[in-house]
Amino acid sequence: MNGAKKMIRIDVSKIKNWELIKEKHSEWYYKKIFPQIDIAIEKIEKEYQNNEFNTKVTYENKNIVKRYIDLLKKIKSEEKNFVIKENLFFDYKVDEINFLSKIMKKEKNKKSILEEMFSSFKIDEEYLPYNLFSYDKFPNHTGKWNRHKLLSLMEIEVCPYCQRNYISSFEENNDKRTTADLDHFYPKSLYPFLALSLYNFIPSCQICNSRFKGSKDTYNSIYPYEESFDDLGAKFKTSKEIIDEILGEKDSEFFINIDYGNLKDEDNKKIQNSISNLGLDKVYKKSHNHYIKDLLENIEKYPKNYLESCIEIFDEYCKDENKKEKIIKYFIDIVKEPYRKRIENGEPLAKLTKDILDEFKIKI
């Protein structure tokens, strides 16, 4: 199985092809992208020096271009390892990361600050990060290395963001294909220099990638290669109305919530941002009520009801309370097995299943 057993966590130590993926991706980058970085530094520095004593260009504007040159030099110094670095932001402090995202931020029908500076310095736009590290340069399904091959080798079968949908690989005309999207955790519109970085790629379902996450800034969110909701202590919980619903005392409406109380502020903020960016509160709040009700009824209610219906057939045997309890336990274990496998294999709704069972102190 893959490394997505915990909701939103990708454990690369459990991805058997990870070293092969890193090797192939770094070789592709070194051949196709890296040579252009050297050229970009040379061309940008030349225009920067030409404008160094231009009084019409402010110090602030010169500083923006200078810091972009410094970033490219850092990237160049990593050679083929840049796109497979775990530490995506080098040793940059938060202020520098915020500065880079600010000058590179692209909005509809509006140039970024960096684009404006390129115009002022008369620097060719092909050296802008959106073009230099363009995701479009990474083939979809052609060539020796492409997105579909990467996704297939990762073998992640369930969306790490929501853990609700399968993302499957398949073959078509002897070619590997997948139903997954390859999402950029740090969006291309804010961090274009990370558009080709392996540790910025998150295999995801189309709903999480397109409808919810989009290009929202995720800098202060749960980063799937490092942590999960479980790691930070966030749990699914139900509202108390579910008890009345299961007992059949009244037809109540209950909700599924994500509880993260009593956590430190930094972790709280990460969880809040992740829930908001992915719309997890919306998709889980009521969408899986029937699943939760069936889960609890199957384990807590139906085995006993089933046994009661068998009493007439096994009347003498079932008068022994000890034997009766053993039979009930046996039935419950049979019912639990599919849920146990769901949790162990990281199948859709695995975390939801485990958290709700924990909430009701049901051992699985």
Feature-to-residue mapping (PLM):
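Extended, Lys/Arg-enriched charged tracts that mediate electrostatic binding to polyanionic substrates
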Residues: M154-P160, I167
